[in-house]
């Protein structure tokens, strides 16, 4: 994983995420990284004083994460059905992980589950990378609260793949 340079994205994103937390003065004491891979983002958050946790479907990835950061809690699980008992201030799912969920109902299940283990006022930050291969469709807005709004843009390409892009402000 790291030998191929795939650690670049979580390292770059981790720095940007910490800057966003500082700039927005967001209170983040606990975090969960879905599809955490080798745990790079968890490590970055842990070193920033956040009680970080991670999960991944790959036993091999979690073994590496545990070896590199034994002080961080990691689970081997499927993010479609994952429902930890603990709640978190921040849940992340980056590195194109949601693009691997091919059924829109399963994407919905992930969002429902995240909502269940996200503390009130918490943040779910994720990415979906594939904007060049999908046609444009009308986005829709959701108001989560008076201060937090999100725009979702759901598209389907010619192969039937579902894509979801979001902007939160």
Which residues are covered by each model-predicted region?
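Conserved class I S-adenosyl-L-methionine
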Residues: 1-27
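A short His-aromatic
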Residues: 99-101
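Class I SAM-dependent methyltransferase SAM/SAH-binding core
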Residues: 32, 39-81
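Residues lining the SAM
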Residues: 94-96
């Amino acid at each position: 994983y790291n030998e191929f340079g795939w650690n670049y994205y979580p390292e770059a994103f981790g720095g940007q995420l910490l800057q966003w937390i500082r700039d927005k003065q967001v209170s983040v004491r606990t975090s969960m990284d879905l599809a955490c891979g080798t745990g790079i983002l968890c490590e970055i958050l842990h070193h920033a004083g956040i009680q970080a946790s991670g999960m991944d479907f790959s036993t091999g990835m979690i073994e590496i994460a545990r070896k590199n950061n034994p002080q961080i809690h990691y689970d081997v699980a499927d993010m479609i059905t994952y429902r930890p008992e603990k709640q978190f201030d921040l849940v992340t799912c980056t590195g194109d992980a949601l693009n691997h969920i091919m059924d829109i109902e399963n994407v919905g299940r992930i969002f429902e589950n995240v909502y269940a283990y996200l503390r009130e006022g918490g943040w779910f930050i994720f990415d979906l990378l594939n904007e060049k291969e999908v046609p444009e469709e009308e986005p829709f807005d959701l108001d989560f609260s008076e201060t937090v709004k999100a725009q979702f843009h759901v598209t389907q390409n010619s192969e039937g793949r579902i894509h979801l892009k979001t902007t939160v402000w």
